Every structure is written in structure tokens, then in C-alpha cells.
From Swiss-Prot:
One BP term from GO: killing of cells of another organism
Keyword Methyltransferase annotated: no
Keyword Amino-acid biosynthesis: no
Family: Belongs to the aegerolysin family.
Alphabetized UniProt keyword annotations: Cytolysis, Hemolysis
Organism ancestry: Eukaryota, Fungi, Dikarya, Basidiomycota, Agaricomycotina
Name of the protein this chain belongs to: Aegerolysin
Subunit composition and interactions: Monomer.
Protein source organism: Cyclocybe aegerita (Black poplar mushroom)
Function: Has hemolytic activity against bovine erythrocytes at nanomolar concentrations. May play an important role in the initial phase of fungal fruiting.
Amino acid sequence: AYAQWVIIII
């Protein structure tokens, strides 16, 4: 569970 805010940053 790490691509839950990374997607928003990218």
C-alpha cells in the first residue's frame, strides 16, 4: 500500500 498518494504526486 504505497501507490495511494504517489499517484496523486505523479
